Amino acid sequence: MKRRDFLKGLAVTGAAASVAGGLGIIPPFITPRTAHAAGRNKLVFISDLHMNVDGSYSWLVKHAVDLARFLNDVNSRDDVAELIILGDLLDDWVSPVKYTPQTFADILAANYNNGVVPALQEVCRNPDIAVTYVVGNHDMLSFMSDNKEVIANTFPGMTIISDSPGLGAYTRDDIIWAEHGHRYTLFNAPDTWSHAGGDLPLGYFISRLAASKSLTSGKVYTTPDLLDLFVKSPAEVNKYLQEGGYEGEAGNVIDNAFIIAVFNAIALWAGFWPWDKFTMEDLDDYTSNPSVEDIAFLYDTIFSGWPSRQNIVDHYEAVLNDLGHLNSAANLLFEMPDRIKDLYPFTPRVVLFGHTHQAAFQYHSGQVETIYANTGTWIDSKPMTWVEIEINNGDSGRRDYTVSLWFYGESSPKQSGTVSVQSEQGYVIRHR
């Protein structure tokens, strides 16, 4: 796949996109109408639910009850026009190294008893609330036809934005741009180059190592936890490399050798040697189970090769973006330099990401107001957060977009701000 094809190969939707993916064209069976007529003018954005099978390595267990309650609350509200899930709805990455990877069907079946799947199904059945799912990295393979069919059959009416190789974005009014955010990260962006016929990046294998360590230690580790620990600490990397008998040591310079040293150190930390193999069962076109050493070899140039794969963010920023710094990617979209203009249909005023598991809110005033917000996550180890956008038409064609960051259990938003734009076009929402 060519670099520009990779960059432009993300599904984008305004009013709707078909279940099969595509370019966001409204299907003929959907009749748009104004949300104002029904008094519904709020968009609710959540991300990083990480539904998984039951297990001591799963990231969502204790918070599942709260998540189900939240979805029921959304369903009962009379001001919500749409629920948008910005990626990592499902998690088929967090699976112990020696386990057969769980399927989407396995995950959905495991989340009936905790109430999350039934609650989301009820929202999908609500004729007054549209539901949209945008692909993340931990459910990257949702673009595959069998996976997409499983999601569509479980949640009838849900719009699925997931195109090969695992990218998608939600847009509204040429103002709002919302996606998971993994596209801008070194370890977690789709990788169609390192393993022929595959799409999974190095972050997938790090997630499986984290799951194995969680299983054996009794403490749940997340991939962001590991990247934060090892990428920021060459001393920690060298500690495990030396214990494992590796020659040389990782320096303070980020390069190919450092990235692979981080992976090898995480493998040793999790209790796996170079010859230990990941059970894949033909997943992502792996016809045989790769060893830790095989994975290190396959991905050994992902840092130096990054600029040839995309030119939105550079390879250094791509590493930082995996450490919770996606605000720089949002600022880039606000600036929209000429070199990336042909990759985006408009210059947004509001940008939403997930992925980092860190809720964030950034408002810039001035001649052009902009807001970046991160939806955070619902996993057990973090506060439960979401973002709402209220859209109101003002005088003389003005439209106000009020963005609010919410923490579960609190009666008022933690932060909020409004972006005002001049527009003559009415706000349109799709209804089934």
Residue map of PLM features:
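Compositionally biased, low-complexity segments enriched in small residues
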Residues: R4, I26-P27, A373, V387
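N-terminal export signals
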Residues: L7-P28
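Extended recognition/assembly regions associated with phosphoester-bond processing machinery
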Residues: A38-R432
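Short, cationic motifs built from Arg/Lys/His that form the positively charged side of catalytic pockets
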Residues: R3-R4, H50
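C-terminal segment of N-terminal export signals and the immediately downstream linker at the start
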Residues: M1, G21-K42
